[in-house]
């Protein structure tokens, strides 16, 4: 999956989506089943009033981007994310890492290792085990 417009200064899903897109995606990921636009609107309205047309426009743009799928049921459409939240974040982090390494090479790798040490030394141990496994598989 192509990397969404990543924003370094955002947080959470807003690194990949606009604020309303992120709220819509969270509503759909948190739902046990597919939702209609009206159901998403009702979920969003708990926090902030949103017009039906605004929600519909954003959801259809997410369909156009390949993030959501929709299917016709009775007289309405039901929407769902193409990927689970975990699968989406996995794909995006993989693509981001690939692009950083492709663009910045060993500098990016060195900074990632430094970040692992600062943020969570256990992650550095996991990386070391992963590297050993990759070397065995060669």
Report residues per predicted region.
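Short alpha-helical segments that sit at the start of domains
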Residues: 1-26
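Short, cationic-aromatic polyanion-contact patches
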Residues: 16-20, 73-92
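Short acidic, hydrophobic short linear motifs in intrinsically disordered regions
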Residues: 34-43
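Short helix-coil junctions and helix-kink-helix linkers
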Residues: 42-50
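Short, hydrophobic-biased segments on the C-terminal half of alpha helices
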Residues: 56-60
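Glycine-centered, phosphate/nucleic-acid-interacting loop/turn motifs that mediate DNA/RNA or nucleotide
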Residues: 66
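Short beta-strand "wing" residues that participate in macromolecule-binding interfaces
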Residues: 70
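Amphipathic alpha-helical dimerization/coiled-coil segments
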Residues: 93-133
């Amino acid at each position: 999956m192509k990397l969404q417009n990543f924003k370094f200064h955002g947080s959470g899903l807003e690194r990949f989506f606009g604020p309303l897109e992120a709220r819509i995606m969270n509503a759909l990921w948190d739902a046990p089943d597919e939702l209609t636009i009206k159901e998403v609107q009702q979920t969003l309205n708990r926090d902030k009033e949103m017009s039906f047309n605004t929600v519909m426009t954003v959801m259809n743009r997410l369909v156009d981007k390949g993030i959501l799928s929709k299917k016709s049921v009775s007289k309405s459409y039901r929407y769902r994310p193409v990927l689970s939240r975990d699968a989406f974040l996995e794909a995006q982090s993989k693509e981001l890492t690939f692009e950083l390494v492709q663009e910045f090479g060993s500098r990016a790798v060195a900074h990632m290792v430094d970040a692992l040490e600062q943020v969570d030394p256990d992650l550095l141990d996991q990386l070391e085990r992963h590297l050993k496994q990759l070397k065995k598989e060669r």
